[in-house]
């Protein structure tokens, strides 16, 4: 699975630790997600998407990215 978590997180100058604390996981989990070594639960993917969207776009919900835009599965992973 590919993600754009690292890109979005760095754009808003958020550390892995800050994101991890915001969604209730360890920094190691965020690192594994960013490096494609961990597939999140739907709930975790939703929490990360929500935090990153709000931090990046504020109240401009029209600009929000979907879970599918942040977490990209290849066909062989489905």
Regions found by a protein language model. Give the residues of each.
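Hydrophobic micro-packing sites on short alpha-helices
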Residues: 45-52, 70
């Amino acid at each position: 699975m590919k993600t754009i978590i690292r890109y979005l997180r760095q754009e808003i100058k958020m550390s892995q630790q800050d994101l991890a604390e915001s969604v209730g996981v360890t920094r190691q989990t965020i690192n594994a997600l960013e490096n494609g070594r961990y597939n999140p639960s739907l709930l975790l993917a939703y929490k990360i998407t929500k935090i990153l969207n709000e931090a990046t776009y504020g109240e401009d919900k029209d600009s929000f990215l979907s879970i599918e835009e942040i977490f990209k599965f290849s066909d062989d992973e489905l």
